[in-house]
Regions:
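Short, surface-exposed connector motifs at secondary-structure boundaries
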Residues: 69-72, 93-98, 117, 140-145
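A glycine-rich helix N-cap at a beta->alpha junction
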Residues: 115, 119-130
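Well-ordered alpha/beta subsegment
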Residues: 71-72, 83, 97, 131-135
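Active-site phosphate-binding strand-loop segment of PLP-dependent enzymes
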Residues: 128-147
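Conserved N-terminal alpha-helix of the aminotransferase class I/II PLP-enzyme fold
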Residues: 35, 40-86, 90-91, 107-116
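Short conserved active-site loop signatures built around small residues
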Residues: 2-35
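Conserved PLP-anchoring active-site segment centered on the Schiff-base-forming lysine
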Residues: 91-108, 126-127
């Protein structure tokens, strides 16, 4: 008796992390993709890669794996943490407010206080573990909560 597909279990996180999008290279025979250490790509290539910070074959593979794990339509990875901070914060507009945990990476604090403040985006830092902060949090009415 064959399995008719009604009892097939959906792959879990571990399986998806290892095997999602698994292919092998006809050219080299490698099963796992190599790490691409180049920073620039030939203009007009099939994949539209131009500079590694904006994407490369490894980014694309990671995005596909994460998208599969999260069962989502889209995923974006970044070349650095501060580029992720900038991308997320750039979705805000003047008058928006960011509520932040007080124990935050220093460069993120500087980005919020020195760069985005110029664009009318306010950041409030508070201890999320302190019950006394609840009123402050409610009164602030943040657009974005940064954990």
């Amino acid at each position: 008796m064959g399995n008719k597909g009604n009892n097939i279990k959906k792959p879990g996180v571990k399986t998806l992390s290892i095997h999602h999008g698994e292919t092998f290279s006809e050219e080299t025979g490698c099963v796992m993709p190599p790490i691409f250490s180049t920073s620039t790509f030939k203009h007009g290539n099939k994949q539209n890669f131009d500079y590694t910070r904006s994407g490369n074959p490894n980014f694309k593979i990671l995005e596909n794996i994460l998208r599969s794990i999260e069962d989502s339509k889209y995923c974006t990875v970044f070349g650095s943490g501060i580029s992720a901070v900038t991308a997320i914060t750039s979705t805000l507009k003047s008058g928006d407010k960011i509520l932040c945990e007080s124990n935050l990476y220093g460069c993120t604090v500087r980005m919020f206080d020195k760069v985005f403040k110029k664009f009318g985006i306010e950041a409030l830092y508070t201890d999320f573990t302190d019950k006394k902060s609840i009123k402050k949090i409610k009164d602030f009415q943040p657009t974005l909560i940064w954990l």
